[in-house]
C-alpha cells in the first residue's frame, strides 16, 4: 500500500493505482470525457489534468500512477484552465449545445463553460447513420474520445468500430466505412452506453416509427 494526499486529504491505495482513483477515494471531483472505469485508461481528452507537487506541468489523472507521498491538487488554477480550454474547444466543434443529460453537458456545467462557444467557427456536419435497426449514429456529435471503439473492442470483442482521421477530421467509422448495418456490429449497445455526447444512441420503437415516417414522406 502507498499513501498520497489529494487536496489535503490523505488516502491509502494499492501501488499502481492512478491519481484519478486516488481522487475518487478522497471524494474529490476530477472532470473526464474519455474515461470509463470499465475500460483501460486512454488519456486522450486531457480534461482530467491535475497538479502534482514537484511536477513541472499538470498531469492527466486517469493515466498517471500514484507514488508514495505524492501531493495532488485537483483544483489547481493552471490545471483547471487546461480542462476548461479543452471543453471549450470540444463544444466549439459541435453544431449545437449537447443535451443536458449527457456527460459532456454535465462536465461543461461543472466547469462553468456555458453560453456561446468561445471560439466559434467550423462545426462538424456529417450525415447521420440511421441504417442500423437498433443504433443511431449522429457523427456530428462525435468528439473522438474513443470510448465507443474501446467498448466494442475491450468489452464486446466485436471490433466493429474504428477511429479514423486526425484533428478536426477525426471520426469513428463502422466496418470498412460502410455503416453500422453492414459492419460486424452485434447490437450489444456497449458503444451507446458509454458515449458521453449521444453521438451513438439506441433506437426506441418510437424513434424507429418517426424515422420510417420521415422516409415515407420524403418518398412521396
Say what each PLM segment does.
Residues 46, 55-187, 193-220:
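Fe-S ferredoxin-like electron-transfer domains
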Residues 7, 15, 42, 164-166, ...:
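Short glycine-rich loop/turn motifs that provide flexible caps or phosphate-binding loops at active sites
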Residues 1-9:
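Eukaryote-biased recognition of intrinsically disordered, low-complexity regulatory segments
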Residues 8, 36, 137-140:
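Aromatic-flanked redox-active Cys/Sec active sites in thiol-based oxidoreductases
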Residues 5, 27-29, 126-130:
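Short low-complexity stretches enriched in small and charged residues
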Residues 10-68, 82:
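N-terminal cofactor/phosphate-binding cores enriched in small/glycine residues
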